[in-house]
Every structure is written in structure tokens, then in C-alpha cells.
A protein has these predicted regions:
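Gram-negative bacterial Sec-dependent N-terminal signal peptides
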Residues: 1-20
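Outer-membrane beta-barrel architecture
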Residues: 9, 65-67, 105-108, 163-165, ...
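Outer membrane beta-barrel
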Residues: 21-35, 52-181, 189-212, 350-354
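Gram-negative outer-membrane beta-barrel proteins
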Residues: 33-41, 86-92, 124-128, 182-186, ...
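Outer-membrane beta-barrel domain signature
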Residues: 51-55, 89-95, 149-152, 182-186, ...
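Short sequence motifs at beta-strands and strand-loop junctions characteristic
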Residues: 55-59, 97-98, 154-156, 187-189, ...
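Detector for outer-membrane/organellar transmembrane beta-barrel domains
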Residues: 196-338, 349-351, 388
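Outer-membrane beta-barrel "beta-signal"
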Residues: 339, 383-399
Length: 399
């Protein structure tokens, strides 16, 4: 049961008014044991070894938070959320130097006019597409598309963001965001923007979204600390994108959808186009593009048991001197057993096979064989070879 503290009704005798407030403490603890057939340093094509280790946040990121609302009257509420992630294996904060790395925002919500929030939060690109992302359909963090390249598992949040989300109108919801870079002399440097829409009606759901993240380092280069899409480094760094860390901008476009056949079977699918745009200061010279398609099938044979299987295929374009474009095929399985309303056991398994070539850490001129990197890049390390097998067993508790 969530621990909800309802503030007593505030008697404002002088004004003759009453207001009701609520604050909720909530969290998730997710810890397990994981295996990788090859674990290597980012950018390395050698020295990878098998490893068995404690893992955390595989099914859902460990976190604690506070969220609340105050009734302002007339159907309007003031809302806020403060949320921090942590490593449940050792107690460390998930992001150094940030007290609330997962969310920190305040805003106003009205059932008729929608919601406006300001602060550190998700982009609409993720918020509205998430219901049909591969990791929300029971494949865990290992089910993210390679390196979470398309950010449908959202490995970052946006600072300084203003987000408007419409009310649900006949199944449709739209949302837009702009995040101010705050860089003197340039409104574009470090800024981010995103738009998205979804439609959910009965067993059918569809969503489409776009986002662009600008580097605060003019012309590209090391991802600037003032970039709104920043949390101790460039967003989205993995074995897939390592050679393109100096991009002037990142942009993503994706379409997701799902259909529930009945109470036991449902399916989701997604397609994304990701572009890392080169600038004068980048270590690569052509815009690098990746296209990814994926599908997840979910089956619930018992009330307490959920099974899922997923497949995705990612292919890069030939650019930056590469003649054999990188490709990644990933297969996923997952099993989740519900012990109670708040507690469950999970098992996840994945296999990925890479092909072609990509850029190494030094960018253009450092062409290397593409190596496998399963999942979102936070819960595993890249392989030093073309293939990688990974799996985990864990327990998750929500409060």
C-alpha cells in the first residue's frame, strides 16, 4: 500500500475557504543476479570476459519519490513530483551530483484544459509512446532496443523543460515540450524540444513522437554540461553510439502501437529513426542514421504469470567512410511471476548479434567492427565481439 498523507482540511477562517492537499511517498526496489557472456570496456574490441554479477533496476529502475497535489478549486490542481533513483545493490545514488535525477517538476493540472509542468521531466516523445515501448511490454531493461538507441526505454530526462499535455479527447492526447538551454548568445544551444500524440481506444493504441536534443557546445564536440538533455554526460552513450558522442544534435522519430486480442494475448510493435547530426566540432562528418523495428508478443496463461517474447532489428546507414553498415539483431524472452500486488519475481534472457562496421571512440578514421550491446546500456556492458548473451533473475518490490 502506498503511504499517502492527506493533509487535514485547511480552515482559512478569514477567507472562508477550504483546500485539500495530498503527498504520496512511493518507490521501487529491484535487485537480482545477472549473467553476460562478454563484458568489456566501452569502445573495446578485445578483452571481454563472461561475468556473473549482482544487477539492479533490470525490470524497473530502483527509486523513491514524493508526489503531491493541492486542490485550487474550479477543477484545477497544483501538482509536483520529486524522484531519485538509486542502486539497490550498494545504496549509491543513480546520478552523481543530482538530488532528484529522475524527476523534479511543479505545475498545474485541469481536467478540461490539460496539464502544464516545469522542471526536470520526461519528454513527450517518451511519455506518450511508452505504453507500447518494448520494455513496458514485459521484456525488462534487457528488452530495450540495442543501446536504447531510440530512447523508448528512456535513459535520460530533460532539464529546464516546459511541458503541456492536453486532456484526453475521444481517445486522443497531444503533448509538446520546450527546454531552455540558457546559453548566452544562443537560444538553440543546449535546448531540446519534443512533440507527440497518441490514440488509445479499447484494445487499440497508436502513438507517434519526435524529439531533438541540442548540444550546448557550439558546433558539436564534448556534450556540454549546459545541455538540457544531460545527466553527467551525453544521453544515449552505448556501444552502438560511442563513436558519435560529439554530435551537434540528436533527433528521434518513432511510431509505436499495440493491440489486445483478449485478456491473455496482446502484441506491440515499434519503428524508429534516429539521427546523430554532425557539426563543425564533431569527430565525424556525416549525419549518422539508424532505423529500428521491433515487435513484442505478450501472453498471460495464469493470473499470476506473464510471458513475453521480443525481436528487434537495427540498421545504420553507410556514412563517415563506413562501407559495411552496422546492424544489430536482438531476441528477448521474459517471465514474470506475481507474488502479491506489490512484489514479483522476474527472469529475462536476451541474445544479440551485430554485423558490419561502426566508428570507435575517436570518431571518423577509427572504423571498427560493430560489437553487440544488449539492452539499455545501463544494466549491462558491451561485448568485445559480434555476439552477446545476457540474462537475469530478480525480485521487485513496489511501495
Amino acid at each position: 500500500m502506498k503511504k499517502t498523507i492527506l493533509a487535514s482540511t485547511l480552515g482559512l477562517a478569514a477567507l472562508g475557504a477550504h483546500a485539500q492537499s495530498s503527498v504520496t511517498l512511493y518507490g521501487i526496489v529491484d535487485t537480482g543476479i545477472g549473467y553476460q557472456s562478454s563484458s568489456a570496456a566501452l569502445g573495446s574490441n578485445s578483452g571481454g570476459h563472461a561475468v556473473v554479477k549482482m544487477v539492479q533496476g533490470v525490470w524497473a529502475g530502483s527509486r523513491f519519490g514524493l508526489k503531491g497535489a493541492e486542490d485550487l478549486g474550479g477543477g484545477t490542481r497544483a501538482i509536483f513530483q520529486l524522484e531519485e533513483g538509486f542502486n539497490s545493490a550498494n545504496g549509491a545514488q543513480s546520478t552523481t551530483n543530482l538530488m532528484f535525477s529522475r524527476a523534479a517538476y511543479v505545475g498545474l493540472a485541469n481536467q478540461q484544459y490539460g496539464t502544464l509542468t516545469m522542471g526536470r521531466q520526461y519528454a513527450p516523445y517518451y511519455s506518450l509512446l511508452a505504453p507500447y515501448s518494448p520494455t513496458n511490454w514485459l521484456t525488462g531493461a534487457y528488452g530495450a532496443h540495442p543501446g536504447d538507441l531510440d530512447s523508448l526505454d528512456t535513459i535520460y530526462r530533460i532539464n529546464n523543460a516546459v511541458v503541456y499535455t492536453s486532456p484526453n479527447i475521444s481517445g486522443f492526447t497531444v503533448s509538446g515540450m520546450y527546454a531552455l538551454g540558457g546559453v548566452a548568445g544562443s537560444t538553440n544551444a543546449g535546448s531540446s524540444w519534443s512533440v507527440a500524440a497518441n490514440y488509445i481506444r479499447g484494445p487499440v493504441g497508436l502513438a507517434v513522437g519526435f524529439e531533438r536534443l541540442n548540444n550546448s557546445t557550439s558546433g558539436g564536440g564534448a556534450w556540454g554540461a549546459n545541455s538540457t538533455a544531460n545527466s553527467n554526460g551525453e544521453p544515449g552513450v552505448s556501444g552502438i553510439t560511442n563513436g558519435f558522442q560529439t554530435a551537434q544534435a540528436q533527433q528521434r522519430f518513432a511510431v509505436t502501437g499495440g493491440y489486445a486480442f483478449n485478456s491473455q494475448w496482446d502484441i506491440s510493435a515499434s519503428w524508429s529513426n534516429v539521427q546523430y547530426v554532425a557539426g563543425a566540432g564533431s569527430k565525424f562528418f556525416d549525419t549518422q542514421i539508424w532505423n529500428t523495428g521491433g515487435v513484442v508478443l505478450h501472453y498471460k496463461p495464469l493470473t499470476a504469470l506473464d510471458l513475453a517474447a521480443g525481436y528487434s532489428y537495427t540498421r545504420a546507414t553507410r556514412a563517415n567512410g563506413i562501407t559495411s553498415a552496422a546492424s544489430y539483431r536482438q531476441f528477448n524472452l521474459s517471465q514474470y511471476y506475481t507474488l502479491s500486488k506489490r512484489t514479483g519475481l522476474y527472469f529475462v534472457e536476451a541474445y544479440q548479434r551485430a554485423g558490419g562496421q561502426t566508428l570507435g571512440t575517436n570518431g571518423a578514421g577509427n572504423i571498427i567492427d560493430a560489437t553487440a550491446d544488449i539492452g539499455d546500456g545501463q544494466n549491462s556492458a558491451p561485448s568485445s565481439s559480434r555476439s552477446q548473451v545476457a540474462g537475469a533473475i530478480g525480485i521487485i518490490h513496489r511501495f
